[in-house]
Amino acid sequence: MIKDSEFYRLDGVPITKEEIRAISVEKLNICPEDIILDIGCGSGGMTVEISKRCKFVYAVDGSKDAIDTTLKNMDKFNVKNCEVYFGDAKDLISNFKVNKAFIGGTQNIESVIEKLNEKNVRNIVINTIVLENSVKVIQILERLNFSIEVISVLISYGKRISSGHMMLSKNPITIITAKK
């Protein structure tokens, strides 16, 4: 995994943290022939990591700043097997032929998941921060007859203080893996 500090960053554009990327990439079970859709690409952390393991990546985001940041990180890490698209994922999914998808964030999550299902995407990994979004995603996936695995991950980093080391936690992330 590439260290978070190595990525180009822009205030207001999120990046999936290194440890969460590691778990999410593993849950995608990427094969060299896979073509993967990264929805809500943000800073391009997952886009870059995924691209090193698969045939091709399509990255989508509704933020121009996110698109620009992803493109800068693709350039920095010499990613050539990826195309980046600005817009609403629900309107763009029909343009892509993919077999796996990662969702790091998006509007219209129900429509997005339904469209992925219609395109026979059989492995979807979805990261959520908001508890209600996790519940909503699980309900949608169950309705569509996906097999679901749900894990909650809390990453803490050690910080040296005068009396020893203190653990500082980041936001807990729910990682939902859906398969058919």
Swiss-Prot record:
It holds the Pfam family Methyltransf_25. Keywords: Cobalamin biosynthesis, Methyltransferase, S-adenosyl-L-methionine, Transferase. It catalyses: Co-precorrin-6B + S-adenosyl-L-methionine = Co-precorrin-7 + S-adenosyl-L-homocysteine + CO2. Its EC number is 2.1.1.196. SUPFAM superfamilies: S-adenosyl-L-methionine-dependent methyltransferases (SSF53335). CDD domains: AdoMet_MTases (cd02440). S-adenosyl-L-methionine binds at T16, G40, C41, G42, S43, G44, D61, A89. The keyword Methyltransferase applies. Coiled coil: none annotated. GO terms for molecular function: cobalt-precorrin-6B C5-methyltransferase activity; protein methyltransferase activity. Pathway: Cofactor biosynthesis; adenosylcobalamin biosynthesis; cob(II)yrinate a,c-diamide from sirohydrochlorin (anaerobic route): step 8/10. One of its GO terms (biological process) is methylation. The keyword GTP-binding does not apply. It comes from the Archaea. Belongs to the methyltransferase superfamily. Archaeal-type CbiT family. PANTHER family: COBALT-PRECORRIN-6B C(15)-METHYLTRANSFERASE (DECARBOXYLATING), COBALT-PRECORRIN-7 C(5)-METHYLTRANSFERASE. This is Probable cobalt-precorrin-6B C(15)-methyltransferase (decarboxylating). The lineage of its organism: Archaea, Methanobacteriati, Methanobacteriota, Methanomada group, Methanococci.
